[in-house]
Amino acid sequence: EAVRSELINGYGLVLLSGLDVGKYDRKSIAVMFMLFGSLIGSLRSQNAAGHLLGHVTDVGADVDDPATRIYQTNQRQTFHTDSTDAVGLLCLRTAKEGGVSMVVSVDAVHERLAEEAPELAARLFEPIATDRRNEQPDGELPWFEIPVLSPSSDGVTGIYQRQYIDSAQRFEDAP
């Protein structure tokens, strides 16, 4: 309950350590990680395949393929949001190179931008074309429009994935 409270009412970030991942097989670790996550909130998939757990590892996927997710490549991830209230990361082994994770508060970014460039901050509340990355439901367009920021009861919520915004431009009818 303390972790959940800190995520919702505190800084929005909690670092936990001490799980000896070398002691367990991958399936057991995955089960423990998902069980812990379910104590914080409802598990939800992040892709059309319904995966509740994604492995951030280079599987040799082509970064230029619109269906590729950046975490399947050896490319550096840029700042982005996942479409959930909370995200969990579990490190199973240290990367040979890179692998650094950084986090930033959407509220803090919005507040800073509103102070320094209010006209740009306002534009983030306007819908922008975003690529579905070949994961659209039947009968839906391969892109959708959504604002980067939306007002919420306690600030703003964000949905931002620059690669998806850029790749939406491959569709002639996307604004």
Provide a role label for each language-model segment.
Residues 27-34, 103-105:
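"Short basic amphipathic alpha-helical interaction patches in structured regions
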Residues 48:
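Structured, acidic catalytic/metal-binding patches in enzyme active sites
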Residues 33-44:
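A short alpha->loop->secondary-structure connector
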Residues 1-2, 9, 14, 21-23, ...:
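Active-site environment of non-heme Fe oxygenases that use a 2-His-1-carboxylate facial triad
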